Amino acid sequence: MANPIKIGIGGPVGAGKTQLIEKVVKRLSKEMSIGVITNDIYTKEDEKILVNSGVLPESRIIGVETGGCPHTAIREDASMNFAAIDELLERHDDIELIFIESGGDNLAATFSPELVDFSIYIIDVAQGEKIPRKGGQGMIKSDFFVINKTDLAPYVGASLEQMAEDTKVFRDKRPFTFTNLKTDEGLDEVIDWIKRDTLLKGLS
């Protein structure tokens, strides 16, 4: 049975978690075997979105209904997600990479290191310029940080330069990037990081 790399995708509701997974999987699935687990509180809406997108066969996507606080299912009691991983591997024992999308949560949400090997935390510009300055644990501790929806900056009065400076203060040298996932702007940086830092591709 495979021992896949597991990458957690966290962030507030509407930041672009599902869209990020859809875009990344569309690219990487040409090169490797991938599975996805989505977490929603009372529905399997994100699972349906990914299935309808056609980026993966339905059998490679599992939706988990967490109930209650979404961060509990990715940190304190991740048993439902562990079970979903086992089910994915029973269906497809060649899976090399699994994305685990958390339910929409606050800036403090982090993944259990027993559940994932790496994590990406995504916010969007529309939430306000001050978000990186708040220094939530999701942003600080994630292995890669994404600030999405850069196209909205002029409409909400957000300075991308200030957001970058604030991010550097809290993340030090940990990588981050800006994206506009509607146009794929910044997507290459995310994929390059995944290949280089999690899959160790291109290293010699």
UniProtKB/Swiss-Prot annotation:
It comes from the Bacteria. GO terms for cellular component: cytoplasm. Keywords: Chaperone, Cytoplasm, GTP-binding, Nickel insertion, Nucleotide-binding. This is Urease accessory protein UreG. Facilitates the functional incorporation of the urease nickel metallocenter. This process requires GTP hydrolysis, probably effectuated by UreG. HAMAP family: UreG. One of its GO terms (molecular function) is GTPase activity. Its main location: cytoplasm. GO terms for biological process: urea catabolic process. GTP binds at G11, P12, V13, G14, A15, G16, K17, T18. It is found in: Cytoplasm. The gene is ureG. Belongs to the SIMIBI class G3E GTPase family. UreG subfamily. The keyword rRNA processing does not apply.
